[in-house]
Structure formats: C-alpha cells, structure tokens
Amino acid sequence: MIGSEGTLGIITEIVVGLAVRPETPATIIATFPHIKSAAAAAAALLKFKPSMLEIIDQTTLKAVESWHPLGFEIAGSVLLMQLDEDQDRADEVLKLCESFEMIDGAASTDAADAVEFIRVRKLAYPALERLGATLLDDVAVPISKIAELVERVEALSTKYDLTIGIFGHAGDGNMHPTIVHDHGDLKAQERAIAAFGEIVEIAQSLGGTASGEHGIGSIKQGFAAAELSPAVIELQRAIKKAFDPKGILNPGKKLP
C-alpha cells in the first residue's frame, strides 16, 4: 500500500508508534562558497547519522536575504544538520565541514538557537513564492549528484530566463526545484513547464528519479514510464486490477 497514492485502497485505521524525543539534539549550520563543497560535505556527514540534513542553494539564499536578511550575503550554499544522538560530536561535524571549504559554522543544543538556525530553511519556499508564481515539485538524485543537478538547473534558469531555486533533503538526495515566473504571463508559464520537464529529465539522466516524496499523480506519469520497464508497468497494472477491479480508487493517477 505504501507508495500506491491511493490507487490500491483506503486507510481506515492507523496505529502509530512514537519514538522518544531526544532531550537536547544538536543543531548545526554551516555555510559554503558554492554548492559543490556543500554537497560534498553532506555526503561525508552521513556517517554521523543525522536526523536532519538540509541543503539550500545560492538562488534561494538570495531570495531569503532580500526578504529577511539573516547574514548569508556571501554564502553559495548552506547546510543544516541535526544530531539526535552523539550530540557531543557537533564539534567533530564542524571540523569535517572545514575540510570542505566551510566559510562559517555554528552548533548548539539550545532550542532557541535551533529555531534561529533552521529559520533560513523555513523561509526558503515563502521567499521564492513572494517573487512570483511558482511551480514546485521534487526530484531525487544520488547524493553524489546533487551539485551537478543544481549546476545544470542553473543553466536552465539562464536558458528559460526564469528564477529557479533549489533546496531539499541532502541526506537522501530529494531536492525541491522551485521555478518562479511572472503572474499572468502565459509565455513565462509555458517556459516554466518546459523547464520543469527538463529538470526531471536531468535528474533521471543522473541516475535519479522523477519523484522522491511528492509522488507521481497525473503530472509525472510520462516521466515514470521512462523509468520503468514494460514488464514492471504491466505488473503494476495487474496488481491494480487485483485490488481494484472496478478502477474506482483514485482513477487515472500514478500508473503510466
């Protein structure tokens, strides 16, 4: 059922198991001169088993700074990390980041500091949204390909004359390209849709996927078909028919 996007059934009851919330997680923020160094650092930081590992590109940072100045004027990228365990290793994390050209960094187990550190990530989408209409979705790539994805999307931004910011979950390569275009400008909207399609194709060419967490729905069915073999598609359709012979569960979604 997981990942079927409502095409195989409905949930009538959920049993939730809650983990104990860590008392004093360590929150770490680090700035880098460019996305390459930040992405390389993110890959190296996985050994610390972070509960959060977020990355923000320069375009998004500029949008945030123009709205709520937070001191990221010279940063090319920002990493945010949280350690629920081994909080005392925060200094070790910052030391490792230094080997990846870190400009500046800080760590704290104080809750108020954590809120302030994470603020830039909370403002990422709203900051881009205030610039115009947005087309936001997600793609996922191997962590080692995050920098290349961002650099190729920057080229698309120039090609289509659009602002495209990227932020997302560096811990699993799930990125959120956010395309900004003028409200009411139909030609700009068409360019945004074309850019969106190319972003998905870039992700797929890098060994990634059309969707990391937002799902396929109806918008990405064609891209999903490009990733799956005919045999896999037929198997999925057979499973759908077995669970939903009348085709009444979220019809027309997910399946290519």
Where are these regions (language model features)?
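Noncatalytic alpha-helical scaffold of FAD-dependent oxidoreductases
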Residues: 1-256
